[in-house]
């Protein structure tokens, strides 16, 4: 008689042993440990066991590969050759311990907000009068995305800036992502997360702060700007929600762009049209049936392929990295992010954020069933800075930004970069945050 298959237990998020006093070794199974449970803000470290890493390599090596795609390009999805190069590097050359050491060298913490343990990195600047900023990642992401910008933001004098550019940096893990707890109930949607971030910043003692984000982080940040708590003085986004209603009407009608669009606006329309026609499948799956994605929780290569297929330009950039042509994002960057998700078993809990955010009243599919609030103005009330990267899937022409944001304080179109700005072009993003928030310091 076969034994029933049961789900593995969730890793404990806390023990009574502070990191500095821990006796944990790489051979022990516990991956998470923090300080005393009754502390409001508890120190945190993450240590994957040797067994967990061996299991990861074993699963990669045991991948059952499909046939090659029947086309010569990526129109059928992530290409076999790319995934085999990624798997070979992941199993034979990639070193997770480097990323782990980099993460644990930073001040990491856990605090309970609204019944859920939330992880965050908190780095204070040595410079007086540093401006506090909360920076939020997106999907498929984790706090690993923002590691490159921490030093330049907190220590600007060592990175080409002045002391007046300094920030205190707070980088939380979205609930269900990375090192934050996985929600066990419904309701952890972007507005709830936005309110949690306000609570976090106030808990840290900040009575005046700014916020920044891309992807889900952009939406969460803009919702914070719409809620407009008195402590939030401005926000910055690298994926602005500016699409006018007549443009969405034209996309839904599938009758071409509205009459009278300028060159930048037409380009933005064409990028959105391309995305809704050929790039939105991942979001539709997660928005409607996230729990069906068991394969990405069981197969590391399956998880990696699903993550790579975010948008066409990002996929092609990542594919070139595994061909030896790094354009800001390296192979290790890509695998650091994927490995965080694998080791924390947060592939499905992260996917559920799309389900939480998706309107459940619309009977249609396609554009009607996607989370349009990623792209439509939501009534930001605080000053906002916008950075438009040319390879972002959702373009934000200046005319749309001026229309969407009555308190637009900064707008700039960058010469290069795409959806993962903090990963791809950290220097540009840091410069944009310095410039964008300069008028509110």
Label the predicted regions.
Residues 130-138:
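Short beta-strand element of the alpha/beta-hydrolase
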Residues 191-209:
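Conserved acidic catalytic loop of the alpha/beta-hydrolase fold
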Residues 51-125, 129, 333, 342-345, ...:
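Non-catalytic accessory segments flanking enzyme active sites
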Residues 139-151:
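The serine-hydrolase catalytic nucleophile loop
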Residues 96-98, 161, 174-188, 222:
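Glycine-rich "HGGG/HGxG" loop immediately N-terminal to the catalytic nucleophile
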Residues 152, 156-159, 207-256:
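Conserved hydrolase catalytic core segment
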Residues 285-441:
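C-terminal subdomain of alpha/beta-hydrolase-fold enzymes, centered on the catalytic histidine
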Residues 153-179:
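Conserved alpha/beta-hydrolase
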